[in-house]
């Protein structure tokens, strides 16, 4: 079963957080802890990420089935926040198993196939000689030769296990399955629960032309934009993201 971290009282409404590509539940620690005064927060590590098991496949049906296993083991019907790849996994989960999901907040991703590639970051991580890395800043410095964005450098090194000098990412499988990650499966189901598609103002991941397919799958879809934020909106504007999540899950009518 997937690894997950929990915050808050089990008696509170459950909220599952699903990270994006190259991330982990731990990346969401600050937001998860802050939301734990209102929710029982479950932050999962998706397959081939963090402390969860590694598998030879990385498709959205498999990821959704992994999430079903966690949800049923906890006997909950959670609200869900899913970012990027995690948002796609959350959408597939809701479309295939609508009775298991309460409300969805999909952060900066649409149920469509994207043409851009994220494999360059895998190659960057592969180029790091981890035998010479003694502290996280060593890896950050080494990554800076291949990844210009400082925030991304720090983000990637959060998935570095210093004790074993290895990545907590199944880079080989993520590379070979990149076509699955960038795509989105055809699903006949619909989700009639409240769903917020929350985009970063500076991001192009949720575009106007995506609304037709979104509305056809998510009957109660709503849209909001976080001003000044890009694709990593929860990291760039954490307080604003947190406040929007609270409003959506507790006071939906404001949207």
Predicted regions and their residues:
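Active-site loop/oxyanion-hole signature of alpha/beta-hydrolase fold enzymes
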Residues: 29, 33-36, 42-81, 243-246
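Flexible "cap/lid" loop of the alpha/beta hydrolase fold
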Residues: 91-95, 102-134
């Amino acid at each position: 079963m997937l690894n997950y971290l929990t915050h808050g009282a089990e008696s509170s409404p459950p909220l599952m957080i699903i990270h994006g590509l190259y991330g982990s539940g731990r990346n969401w620690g600050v937001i998860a802890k802050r939301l734990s005064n209102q929710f029982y927060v479950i932050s999962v590590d998706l397959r081939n990420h963090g402390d969860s098991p590694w598998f030879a496949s990385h498709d959205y049906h498999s990821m959704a089935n992994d999430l079903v296993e966690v949800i049923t083991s906890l006997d909950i019907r959670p609200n869900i926040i899913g970012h990027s790849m995690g948002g796609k996994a959350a959408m597939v989960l809701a479309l295939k198993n609508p009775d298991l999901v309460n409300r969805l907040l999909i952060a900066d991703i649409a149920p469509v196939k994207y043409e851009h590639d994220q494999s360059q970051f895998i190659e960057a991580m592969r180029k790091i000689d981890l035998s010479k890395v003694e502290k996280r800043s060593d890896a950050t410095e080494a990554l800076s030769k291949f990844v210009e964005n400082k925030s991304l450098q720090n983000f990637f090194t959060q998935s570095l296990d210093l004790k074993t000098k290895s990545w907590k990412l199944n880079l080989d499988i993520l590379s070979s399955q990149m076509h699955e990650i960038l795509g989105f499966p055809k699903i006949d189901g619909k989700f009639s629960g409240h769903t917020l598609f929350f985009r970063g103002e500076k991001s192009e991941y949720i575009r106007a032309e995506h609304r037709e397919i979104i509305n056809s799958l998510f009957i109660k879809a709503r849209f909001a934009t976080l001003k000044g934020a890009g694709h990593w909106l929860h990291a760039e504007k954490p307080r604003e993201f947190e406040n929007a999540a609270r409003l959506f899950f507790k006071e939906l009518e404001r949207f």
